[in-house]
Amino acid sequence: MKKFKFLAALFAGILLAGCSNSNATDNTSLSLNDSTAVAVKEYPDTATLIFFGDAMQHKMQLTRAITLGTKENPYNYDDCFTLVTPALKDADYSIVNLELPLGGGKDYSGYPMFSAPDSYAKALQDAGFDLFLTSNNHCLDRKDKGLRRTLDVLDSMKVDHIGTYRNLEERTKLVPFIKEINGMKVGFLNYTYGTNGIKATNGAEVAYIDRNKIKEEIEATRKAGAEIIVAMPHWGVEYVLNENESQRSLANFMMNEGVDIIIGGHPHVVQPMKVVTDPITGRRSLVVYSLGNFISNMTKANTRGGALVRVVIERDPNTGEVKFRNAEYDTFITEVPSGPGTNFRVVPSWEIDKLPAAQKGNWTQHNNAVQKLYDKYNVDVPRSTKKYQAASNN
């Protein structure tokens, strides 16, 4: 997406001459050969970030991956995420919550102590995800060893990840995490409310929600050069469609400390999205309380699917400031296997014709519930009208 332009040597020379110091000595001179050109990077003035919710693996998903496996790929998740690839590729940076450790061995499992094969994460990467969030209530399901192995696997995949660390020293080294996206320096932070009562026993480091630490890391991220900051807390109450006072309080705290975009997870159902405008400064921030599940085998009301949110940030051409521009959402549902060769699969609204007829009722219920909630509570975050080119698989 980056564009380059070359400035003619004459123009460069004029600029240099115009900036010459009148106090320079007579034998000081600047010259450019006629064939010299100066390469200047030119970026678009916007960047699009796309966020999805909780990537889960329950027992039936694991069983299906084994059923469809081959000698070369014994745990097959290849088709699970491909229908959303057009949306991921259309964005400049794509983020997902990896709500499980990659435990290794053959002792994989679903709820309540998750552990998934490495191929699960690889399928997410192949679909187009760039950043994996690892700070959530299941990151210590396989204790310190599983947490560290997850990081080893993600590092071997050369994919970005934040939220958990091998030790405190590594956290100090890797935070702030700043990504340059279309020339804009974006800081990312990830925290969790807890880890289901499991504590690290061998020095592994989890980014827990701690206001003093959050404040410290926000300040460090700004100081390190971030022009805009995104925080992604794992918070709230499961299966509740509205945020609670604790979430609102933490969101206000983070915005007051300088966070521009907040994308929450954990409830396994969607919660409202709101653009918040500071009445004094006019600064606009985005709060998404929960995106719900990305993929799972949950069957409780409102857990079969979730929402994605596309966020556009921009560089102001007049001030050079990077800021939040707008956001829009879309919906999707998890298709469950319906015959030989089929797998659990995320089916977005623009591909809903590929959902088996017998599951259309689940889609209607989920989509209508999300639409009703968002129509009532969303503030300046409309449904997307963007159309993506259909994925190639059926």
How does the language model describe each region?
Residues A9-F11, K106:
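C-terminal/domain-terminus segments
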Residues L15-G18:
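C-terminal motif of bacterial Sec signal peptides marking the signal peptidase cleavage site
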